[in-house]
Regions:
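Short, Lys/Arg-rich flexible segments
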Residues: 1-141
Length: 141
């Protein structure tokens, strides 16, 4: 037979479980966001370039259309970061570029009328799906 508890005990237990759930959520969001950031930087470094096309004095070879952008000066690569904040009972993760010219990362991700997309953020999220699924199972069972 189940042990009877008082309303006060029940509320304390509920509060404890609520705090643990929020801590677990924050851990999941923090680790997932960091992995997406790491993956975005890795896929840019490892992207396939087009040797038949060259731009600029240095002879920068852009990535093949549809692949993440190739690193040229490293501006985008160095600007990618993540942050996690807690608002009420939610842990919110953000991954993106803190570059001052906000059009640059967006133009690479989605393309322009003259340039095909070089997705870096969405490609990172796709690559991290299994990592996040396994992490979810590890944290939440």
């Amino acid at each position: 037979m189940a042990k009877a508890i008082s309303i006060d005990e029940f509320q304390r237990e509920l509060e404890r479980y609520s705090k643990q759930a929020l801590a677990d959520s924050k851990r999941f969001v923090t680790l997932s966001s960091a992995e997406v950031e790491r993956t975005a930087k890795t896929i840019m470094r490892d992207t396939i370039t087009n040797p038949d096309v060259s731009y600029g004095r240095k002879g920068h070879h852009p990535s093949v259309e549809g692949n993440p952008p190739a690193v040229d000066k490293g501006t985008l690569l160095q600007s990618i970061t993540h942050s996690v904040k807690v608002e009420g009972n939610e842990a919110i993760g953000e991954v993106g570029s803190i570059i001052s010219n906000s059009d640059y990362p967006r133009f690479l991700e989605y393309g322009t009328s003259k340039m095909k997309p070089r997705p870096w953020l969405s490609a990172s999220l796709i690559k991290c799906q299994s990592f996040m699924a396994n992490l979810w199972k590890e944290i939440f069972g």
